[in-house]
Every structure is written in C-alpha cells, then in structure tokens.
C-alpha cells in the first residue's frame, strides 16, 4: 500500500516513503557557514516569522476551506475522511529551506579547477593579444595603456564605481562586465567551470582559425548545399585544399582530412589532461545536410505559427574593409553603414544567411521545444509521468511549460559563466582585431608575431584579390560586440538550451519528414531522403550551427564556440541537478548523450 506522504505517523513504512530530501540532516543552529554565532537568535526569529507568514498566506490563498471569524484567520479545514489529513505547512516550508541548503552545500563542494590562460596579456606589454575594442587606440590600432589599465582596475577591484571610470574611446559601451559577478541561486558557480586556454596569438592553431575565418568571409554567398563531397564549387574546393595544408587545424575531418562535407561543421573543446584540449565532434553533426532541421521547420505556437523563413542580407554586405573604418570600430565608434536586406524572405540557404541568423537570432530554442512537443517526439524515458497510470505533468513539473522555464533560466545563467571567462580570465582579442594585426604587419611593417601560415595561405591572397584588403571582412557593420572573444556567449546559450532539450525529450527519436531548402528556389523546401536524422543529432547540429554562424559573421574564432559548447553543457547539467532536489515525484534522472558521445544520467 502506498503511504500518504503527508502522514504524521511515525511508522518505519512512512519514514521510507519520505523523499530523499526529507532524510537530509537538519542544519545545525551553530553552523558557521549559514549562521553567525552572535546572530543565531535573530536568525531563528526571522526564520520563524517567515514560516508564520508563509503559513498564513498559504492558509488564506491556498484553500477554498479558509474562513475568517471574528477578525482572526482560521487555517484550512479538511473533511474528516480517512486519508485527508491537514497539510503540514511548516513541514513543507522547512523542506524547501533544507532543499535550498542542500543545493548550496552540493554546489559549494565542487572543487575550483585551474584557470590557465594563453599568457598573451602578460606576454605583450602593448596588449596586442588582448581585447581592447571600445577603448581608445593609437593610429596603428594599439590600445592606449591608461585606458586598458582602467578596465583591468575595475575588473580587479570589482568596485561598481571603478566600472564607471573605465576610459572609453567612443560612444559604444562595454557589454555587462559586472553581470558575471551576480550570484546565481541555482546551478554551478562560474569559477567552478574550466575551459581550455584559447590558442595563443602567435600559435599555429590561432593561424589556422584565422585562415578558416578568411574562408568563411570568402564563401559567404555560397549555398550551403554546396558544402558536400560531390560539390563542384571552386571556392569550396579551394578552401578545403588550403585548410588541409595547415599544421594545427582542429575542425572536423574525415579520415584525417577536411572535406567539403566537414567544412564549417562544428566541434566541441573540452579540458583535457593538464592544460591540454580535447577536441570532439558531437554525434550527428556530420550527418546529413549542413543545416539543422530545427532551423527549417515551422514552429507551432498555440493557435499561431512562426515561419522558418528569415530576412536575409543581400550579397556583398561586407564591412570593416577600410582601415579607417576598422579603426573607428576599435575605438568604439560607428562605421556609419548598415546592412541592405533582400525584400523577400527565404529559408537559410547560404553561409551569409546563417551568419545573419546568428547575428539577430530568433525563437531558436523555444521554437525547438515547440516543434518537439508537436511532432510526435516522446518525452525522455526518465520522465516520471511517461509510465504513470493516473497523472500527467504540467507547467509545475515535467511538462513543456516547466521545460521552457528552465530554458530561459539556463540562458541567463550560462551568460554569467561565459562572460566571467571573457572578462575575468582570458580577455582574448576578437578576430577583427587580429585582422588589424595582419594588415599592419603587411602594410606598415609592424613587428607582430603572427604565424607564417596565415601569410602563406590562399585565404589571405584571395581576400586581397576579392576585397582589396588584408583586414578580415565582417558581415556586421558594427563588428563584434564589445566584450572579449573567449568563450562565446551565443554558443554557450546554444549549448545550455540544447542540453536541456536532450534531457527533456527522447533524443533517439527519428525526425519525421525532414527537409532541405530547394537549391533552385530557397523560398521553398524539398524532402530530404538520406540517412535518418535523430532529435539528438539535430539538436547537436543546431548548437554547432549557431556557434559557427557567429564565425560566418566574422566575430568569433572556432575555439570560442567550441569551448563555450562544453561550458554551456556543464551549466545545464548543474541546473538539472539542483532542480532534481526539489521534486516530489519518484524520479531516477534524465539520461542523455553529451557532446562528446558519453551517456550521463542527471
């Protein structure tokens, strides 16, 4: 017989029926972590007052049996039936208190990992390896050290007034440097998440990432349908050949070589042993079409729907090609230019289209949840209501509204973690700034330590012949956002959302009726008839599409997105762990596949 969970009986059977959290050790009043010894009486009284207030509110608002008599509130009265005992308000509130203490204890017990950098900030006194956009620069584009020091002073003292004294070079403000210092009440702390150090300025790996970015700029108006092994596109073939000559290119390969099918596909970077990096390709990312199905399907939203057709930038919308325009952006100014758009919406069908989608964004992950909820995708088998004979979930727990609330929460919390790496650890320069170093080394003979593989590449030669510049062409007139490059915030957001969606839904479900944009008319789609596409694989592809899409715009290195995907995954897992502590349902955890192919149960 199932024991009433609200029973006050002290039987052994009733004790066993209590949830795991109910068994947690009661916190000691003398605990130094949560209560100071001199404030214990005040803390106790305050907590008692909270319990009393909660009881009154619950009694008045939570039950139709509440009544008012002689000006005094009377708690809810229950019919005298066998299993209808009065709800224990204090026990419920105390359980919430103990769950929160346990969540804090668990998170506090996670060790703080090392946070190695690439050493560029210390290596170069003129800060050419560090992000300084938005601050004033000299005529070469080197930051004025007084301004850079005003930034690092604020980041060191963390005094809100010091942030207001950062010396800016123009009207453009820095993006949320204090945001990462906010303390999240759920999930892991930013300092407890490790990412590999980014490639150093002078390294062959950084050179390889730069060459890839120059090719992404050159191929912006190439259809994504040409990124397959039977391609006849000469630019695609030239890019593949050039990338295969690089000594340290870490993007996806087949049989040890870059192919048209692997070109510009995504990857994930985890912390390896020591300060090394472990490079992986998530399951499904190399399967089928380049673009995830979640970017091609109509989003059903109640009685409405959201079309997957997007506003696209016209070919030739490339910016920061002129050094003075580039310098104005570095100084926090404006290019004075804007994107010219195609008046007719269409499906994402070119490299530029995906870059523009990643520039502006849309209801990407909310949309994916709505698609999954409507196309027959089963819930994750670990969902306790999958096998319930009498109940279903709701917005409270284990149904779409609950999942969507966690998606929104995850998006905020992961940005705190990503921006902490940006501002308080790495301060890595953006690709557009690297392009300025390349330009100045060639045009002004500046002695910058750029690896020779950049200058020997066909990517740089073709950039000059196409755009008449050695700067990295940008797809956005403002260039990159005014915070540093590593790790990528948009990619981290993609990862936390995709990981949560894999926890909520059955990732092994095969997506029905997949489509691809019609290469002859990208305002339409046609059926895809290749190998099966699973929910998990297409969610992984969605995350990597978004991460690489930022590179299509010219604003992020591959490693920015690849490291951020691992970071976002870890934030999602920590949120699920905290959330689990509060459930009343019998729940054995969500099992899903991480980006590195390992199975986890949370």
Where are each of the predicted segments found?
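N-terminal secretory signal peptides
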Residues: 1-40
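N-terminal non-cleavable signal-anchor helices
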Residues: 4, 30, 57-61, 582
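Short, flexible helical or helix-coil boundary motifs
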Residues: 24, 28-31, 52, 247, ...
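Hydrophobic alpha-helical bundle signature of multipass membrane enzymes
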Residues: 36, 41, 59, 65-558, ...
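N-terminal export signals
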Residues: 45-66
